[in-house]
Amino acid sequence: FCPFDYRDPVNKQANLPVVEAFHFTPDVESLRRGSTGTVLGDLQYTLRAFPNHHRALKSIARYALEGGRFQIDDYIPSADCYFERAIAFRPDDAAVHVIYANFLFKRGDRDDARKQYEEALGLAPESVEINYVAGLYFVDVGDLTRARKLAKVAYDNGYPLPGLKKKIAAAEAAEKSRAK
């Protein structure tokens, strides 16, 4: 029966609607309340069926960052375990690496976040979204040279949001004022 690849169009059409209708509802995704039980229970069901379900991984990351509790005796006792399972299931899914990197960075694990961003960039070097998000990370950790390169890829290929450009400009201005 499962697990299913979230990116597979056949599985998305045949199996995803049932999982999302009963377990990954808008209330579960937003962590407001569970559909068939607890929020965590519905997220667990969704991620058992689709280990690399991008939106559910974002939700489990938010759940953990907001202090949600995982059962110690559960077979997947932490958000990290869900990400590790998703990566083991489909190591070529660059989006999973980016979502995990974002989670790690927000949690303060900069070195591990960097590894996941690098993995995502290696899997999808031309992805404007991945270049943009990784560029934001590199600005935040002070690697402006790398951030500029990633921004160039993103913006040369049509990325519409100006946030990375603005962050780079602000970081450059701060560098110049410190140099004075």
Go through the PLM ranges and name each one.
Residues 46, 85-86, 119-120, 153-154:
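Canonical positions in the second alpha-helix
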Residues 1-44, 49:
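N-terminal leader/linker segments that initiate helical-solenoid repeat arrays
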Residues 58-59, 95-99, 129-136, 149, ...:
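Alpha-solenoid helical repeat scaffolds
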Residues 49, 89, 123, 156-157:
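Structural marker of alpha-solenoid helical repeat scaffolds
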